[in-house]
Amino acid sequence: MPTILVSALETSSNVHLEELRRNLPKDYRFIGVFEGSGALYSPREFSVMGFRDVIGRLGFLFKVYKEMIQLAKQADMVLLMDSSSFNIPLAKKIKKQDSHKKIMYYILPQVWAWKKWRAKTLEKYCDFLGAILPFEVSYYQKKAQYVGHPLLDEIKYYKKDIKGETLVFMPGSRKSEIAKIFPLFVEVARILEQNEGFKRRVLVVPSFFKGLDLKALYGEGIEWFEISYDAHKSLFEAEFAFICSGTATLEAALIGTPFVLAYRAKTMDFLIARMFVNLHYIGLANIFYNALNDETPGLGESQLHPELIQHFLSVESLIRAYKDMDRERYFKESLKLREYLMHGSARKIASEIAFLLNLT
């Protein structure tokens, strides 16, 4: 039975991993960090935000790092997904420990945004680099291949027009995000019900919150919303969405749902991030839309959807974005973005895993 050491610390990575596993033979055994039986740790134990939060958990992260290095000895190959701050040092250590160990990196770090030197590091220590964006490959020498975007494996609903019956609210999956964004969304929902007559307001809740006390997690105002655990279906049925920054923004764009990105970080974290990452946009859909228009990703002039960040984010600005958005233009351009990303990646990655295992 082939054994694969997996390091998938992000919630979104585990959604992609689930689709990948459907395309692999049943007898493959997974060990490491992922969501599911047999995991050493769940990704929920890594949901920290901000520089100070990470510093406070360095002891735990170093413990996991050492355990993963030991686990690698049992594995036939290694699959690293996203989370470059953890996974790049892990790749280096595992390769130095066993130079013959095959390492695949799927969902590459955003070297086009910052720390471009990481591309050379990945080339040196990994055997296959699975790029999910067409323009990423140009930042690497020879080991990177464009494999398609995993969201196009997972999304089953695509709009044929911009009609919808609901307003969808997605305030993030981390408690720190929810605390900052959800109160604004509650007020927006109240105002739009009064002024626009919307009766159906849907709060999309991460599936791993099932069984938890949602009132304790979200606080006052949750009674204003219908609860949904199906983001894709909810976005498909929506007339408009209010979304905290993250993978959900790209999901909305691919489905074709008009939306506004809302994000507010701790002031110190935001200032530190700005020192290292100089981007006009933080939304994945806008970043990819720049590339689609032959502009530098994240630094172009073209914009698919509005972004309201830090002090620009308020109840008033959210409502203004809802009212002012050119929905017809957005929908037409979102179809171009869907075509740009073309196809999913699970089947391609599964075949590459089988190929690497045959080399061991």
Swiss-Prot record:
BP term (GO), one: lipid A biosynthetic process
Pathway participation: Bacterial outer membrane biogenesis; LPS lipid A biosynthesis
One GO MF term: lipid-A-disaccharide synthase activity
GO CC terms: membrane
InterPro entries reported for this sequence: Glyco_trans_19
Family: Belongs to the LpxB family.
HAMAP family the UniProt entry points to: LpxB
Protein name, UniProt field: Lipid-A-disaccharide synthase
